[in-house]
From Swiss-Prot:
Keyword vocabulary terms for this entry: Cell cycle, Cell division, Chaperone, Cytoplasm, Isomerase, Rotamase
Stored InterPro entries: PPIase_dom_sf (IPR046357), PPIase_FKBP_dom (IPR001179), Trig_fac (IPR005215), Trigger_fac_C (IPR008880), Trigger_fac_C_sf (IPR037041), Trigger_fac_ribosome-bd_bac (IPR008881), Trigger_fac_ribosome-bd_sf (IPR036611), Trigger_fact/SurA_dom_sf (IPR027304)
Keyword S-adenosyl-L-methionine in annotation: no
Documented EC number(s): 5.2.1.8
Reaction catalysis annotation: [protein]-peptidylproline (omega=180) = [protein]-peptidylproline (omega=0)
Compartment annotation: Cytoplasm
Source organism per UniProt: Desulfosudis oleivorans (strain DSM 6200 / JCM 39069 / Hxd3) (Desulfococcus oleovorans)
Molecular function GO labels: peptidyl-prolyl cis-trans isomerase activity; protein folding chaperone; ribosome binding
SUPFAM superfamilies from the UniProt entry: FKBP-like, Triger factor/SurA peptide-binding domain-like, Trigger factor ribosome-binding domain
One CC-aspect GO term: cytoplasm
Protein name: Trigger factor
Length: 443
């Protein structure tokens, strides 16, 4: 076997493989011999048909099978011979197999980039320390109260307000014609301010009184998910049929007990604060990690294999799809396409692939490994997050070796990041209060 490598880039190679004619002949003969044992040809007993007839009848089938067999048996050896650390599946371009000459094919492959040793020690970093405020705790309490809110008829007649629950009839017209995506509705339940139809629609309903009919126009944004509505001005005729207001439960110990094993409102507040602060702590860690990668990317340069980018992009799109599915939504219903999302998140996928490559380089560079004790700690951490016994989690992973490999690598990446930060100068800073808030989960 003769193998040559054509460089298309630092990470993209084309292997040109030539298999000698004597090997081709041997495999073809073996292929026809195998066919001869089972072929049913009129006038001949199994195994007795002449080779000339077999070649005439089964040439295409045997040549196709032998081509595949030659590629499958030779490609791993060719990759090992050239010491290539490939990523993903090769793209094969075979020649036409012939009995008279060698068999050749090319395999386009991607390889992991060769990254020089990275000097990751002595980075200067700033870790933002976010703190949960009393106002944020109060906001979460309000959200919890809304979960138990009751609707009741307004005590005294008044105009509709934000947050009211209204029942309305409406008609929608575009140039005087009905709108397919907004069919006429009777007894439509509208929470004013929710934007169920459009925020501007809700604003027009505010101020109406029960029994009133109002006609108004709403111009939908060009980016609206409905092609029928996007950029168009729709005329609505709305009749307010009834109005209820939201009554929140009192904020007391009894309320707290409805959200978990809390003996008092103060205990619930403490749990909310802990969860919010946990979210802020994660945000601070994430921003610190971003600084690490920004600093390390300035110290090295390399190409990223498209296979890795596509793998990260597939993960992002799968997560989006799962999120939409949880709310019974779809890309089509929201006016989005997989192609548009792929373009939108491609830079994110490239960045994630670079992160993995950098950490993998440092892991190899420092000869890091995960001990049995560290793996056990990983099981404990997963068990705690899932609310499951550690033994059950351990048993699951022991029955799934591939998942253990994934867990080990995840733990290795965390270990590498921890070592990088420990070797850095980290200044704790108070973040800009005008920056967007990111809070944790509520109780």
């Amino acid at each position: 076997m003769h193998v040559t490598v054509e460089d298309q880039s630092t990470i993209k190679k084309v292997l040109h493989v030539e298999i000698p004619v004597e090997v081709v002949s041997r495999e073809l003969n073996a292929g026809f011999d195998q066919i001869r044992k089972t072929a049913k040809i009129k006038g001949f007993r199994p195994g007795k048909a002449p080779m000339s007839m077999l070649k005439r009848l089964y040439k295409d089938q045997v040549h196709a099978d032998v081509s595949i067999q030659l590629i499958q048996s030779s490609l791993p050896n060719a990759i090992r011979e050239k010491a290539l650390n490939i990523i993903g599946d090769p793209q094969i371009n075979p020649s036409v197999l012939s009995e008279e000459g060698p068999f050749t094919y090319s395999a386009t492959i991607e390889i992991k980039p060769e990254i020089d040793d990275i000097d990751f020690k002595g980075l200067t970093l700033k870790k933002p320390l976010y703190a949960c405020t009393d106002e944020e705790v109060d906001h979460q309490l309000t959200l919890l109260r809304k979960n138990l809110a009751k609707l009741q008829d307004i005590a005294e007649p008044r105009p509709a307000q934000e947050k009211d629950a209204a029942i309305i009839d409406y008609q929608a017209r575009l140039d005087g014609q009905p709108v397919a995506d907004l069919p006429d509705e009777q007894e439509f339940h509208l929470r004013i301010g929710s934007g169920a139809i459009d925020k501007t629609f809700d604003q027009q309903v505010v101020g109406m009184t029960v029994g009133e009919t109002r006609t108004f126009e709403v111009t939908f944004p060009e980016t609206h998910g409905s092609k029928t509505l996007a950029g168009n001005t729709i005329s609505f005729t709305v009749t307010l049929k009834s109005l209820k207001e939201e009554i929140l439960p009192e904020l007391n110990d009894e309320l707290a007990a409805q959200f978990g094993p809390f003996d008092s409102l103060d205990q619930l507040k403490t749990e909310i604060r802990k969860n919010l602060q946990s979210g802020y702590d994660r945000r601070g860690e994430q921003e610190l990690h971003e600084q690490v990668f920004t600093a390390l990317l300035e110290k090295t340069s390399f190409e990223v294999p498209e296979t890795m980018v596509q793998h990260e992009l597939d993960g992002i799109l799968d997560e989006i799809d799962r999120t939409y599915s949880a709310y019974n939504l779809s890309l089509e219903a929201l006016g989005q396409t997989k192609e548009a999302l792929s373009e939108k998140y491609r830079d994110t996928a490239v960045k994630q692939a670079k992160r993995h490559l950098i950490l993998n380089k440092i892991i190899d560079q420092e000869k890091m490994a995960i001990s049995d004790d560290e793996l056990a700690e990983g099981f404990e951490s997963i068990a705690k997050s899932m609310g499951q016994p550690a033994d059950m989690v351990k048993q699951y992973y022991q029955g799934n070796p591939e998942q253990i490999d994934v867990l080990r690598y995840t733990l290795l990446e965390k270990k590498a990041m921890r070592i990088i930060i420990e070797g850095s100068t980290v200044e704790e800073v108070t973040p800009d209060p005008s920056s967007p808030d990111t809070a944790g989960d509520q109780a």
